[in-house]
């Protein structure tokens, strides 16, 4: 009954967020790709348009490097990123799978209400983050801003989040292919990485006027052929800390290659038809059963925690609760300007970014790694059951298609599936977590970003190839 009341409660609120209509005519693949490209362009534009009316303060970015992982922009309108959309999707999917909210996905009206509920929760999270950012003093104190600019700043941050919700819905309603958040986050990470690899922008590194190229590959090539002192010039680009170094670029390539290789690792479960004798095939059970989804949901929660922790630190810096939860140390050098987490409970949820960070703070590294593995394994099992990937769901699929596992009777198949499928989900989360920790240590958020982007871009690529194959077959 509580679940039914929740769905009915969402119904009047959903009228505030009108539904996007699906295409009225059949769209060709090229048209869908055009819609997807258009949504990506709009999202990128929102990420670079500055916030109007903000005070020019010396406030340091509390999230800094982590923004590449949550789709946010430190100075643009999309400062809240995609974390609210991912978090709302995860929470409602889990609640529905646990029967905490009553949703019958066989009914169109319930599916529509559930999608509207995700939009409403996403919008509420965007509003909460917008109020939190402005209240924290990130854009200036309330006394300097005044009530009008205070409200205007909140609206400027909140409304792009609503636009982002609709960009995702446009893609998922049939105008595009696959998942909207997957496409937008993948494009955001990929765009940031390409900029840090190939950018021709130069930035100063010291007061003497020396500068370097933003792009690691461009900088390496320039330093290799432009300076007589090769050792000194190459060292500055190979191991720099204020941007993507060339060594980190090589680590990113290794992370990409490792992930793409493991995509093909699987166990083939032999199955046969219960109706036609002699017909055998394999049911592939991938090592990356839940891919990077648990990791993304962990980061979406962490993104919210970082914003709330920063607001608490800004408003009550000396309180006992603040010191227990979060402690910052400002890094304000000529080349770097950021707030770095150095203590508190939230600190142990933040990844060690850099080899020196991991070696100098081994307790943090160990606690974070163990915590990440435990949380992602738990999320992986939750997501497995929430998305019809659990043992009972697979068994139902077999029964509907009159398939049985070779060597097992229909009555004993569930026990076998309950052995192998949860193990696959746990191994998937464990491997992705370990790879993300290694990538973070040796290539900062660039390495973790490559890991996530590889999975998201590959998922989008599979959708495009599948759609193209269907069109080629006349479906």
UniProtKB/Swiss-Prot annotation:
GO terms for molecular function: protein transmembrane transporter activity; ribosome binding; signal sequence binding. GO terms for biological process: post-translational protein targeting to membrane, translocation; protein insertion into ER membrane; SRP-dependent cotranslational protein targeting to membrane, translocation. InterPro entries: SecY/SEC61-alpha, SecY_dom_sf, Translocon_Sec61/SecY_plug_dom. It comes from Schizosaccharomyces pombe (strain 972 / ATCC 24843). This is Uncharacterized protein C19G7.17. One of its GO terms (cellular component) is Sec61 translocon complex.
